[in-house]
Amino acid sequence: MKEFRSFLSPQIHSFIRYRQASQRWNDSSYEENLMLFDHYCHANDPCATALTQEMVDGWCRQRRTETNNSCRSRIYVVDSFVRFLNMRGLSNVQPPQIPRKERRRYLPHAFTEEELIRFFHECDSIPVINSRKETIIRKMSVPVFFRLLYSSGIRTKEARLLLRENVDLRRGVLDIQYSKGHDQHYIVLHDSMLEIMRRYDAAINGIVPEREYFFPSIRNSHFNRGWVTKNFNLLWRKANTSHATAYEFRHHYAVTNLNQWTGYGFEFHDKLVYLSKSMGHTTLESTKYYYSIVPGLSEIIKEQTENSSEWMIPEVPLDEETY
């Protein structure tokens, strides 16, 4: 854990332990934003011994360069921290005013076969530098990690936090414990992906024995969100000129399956339920979102299933966590 500087340090550590215990903590974003707030308090009043309204309001005020959503992301953990203190009688400061959430129309990148071929070629071409252990792990892990995203629709966070004990390499089933909303679900691997995972497991075990996570870092922990973003961006930009993100493999997986099912009529519903469960959606509404990003698909489904499709087609796409 990184160093907190202000008088709030003991209370921040208590807050983090509390959130981790309740599985409501995100190392990559919450800790960073909480640390920035801590450093802000220390820089502006290094002799302070109590949290003040001015500290909270000064840090949480929306900046001219921020959208409502980016401001919400930055101050959310501070709002939660203030409420944590208030509930325990450690502060009487009012939580910050959080801007209204803006609904965004998001159109994910549509991967082409050529783009994917070039990208995975770059993944497979990662060099080992001076036999350094860190570069060996990267060369072994990156191609498998991104192929898992591509072939299963798993969330990037789910893949990062995937425990080795929750990967059944005999049956080819992933037990997803850490997910959006903390709902456990299962993913069945394609045979080709299962074989890749088996080879990776045997190889990486020789580098990081007795590892806890299926994709281990050099410190035998899990990779953070920045690792995913950095590696994807670096390799994607080497291979392609278009903009894309690692999370869009999940969209690609859903859309590819939906496109393959347009001729199945009423069987489509059964397949949709299976897809929804395997992607970890708590309701079919979340899966229906993908209709809106498949050109013409909703009209095709209406033609095939007539009035029975009314419950399938969403009017407004739902937000999906992107990490």
Predicted regions and their residues:
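Conserved catalytic core of the tyrosine transesterase superfamily
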Residues: 1-323
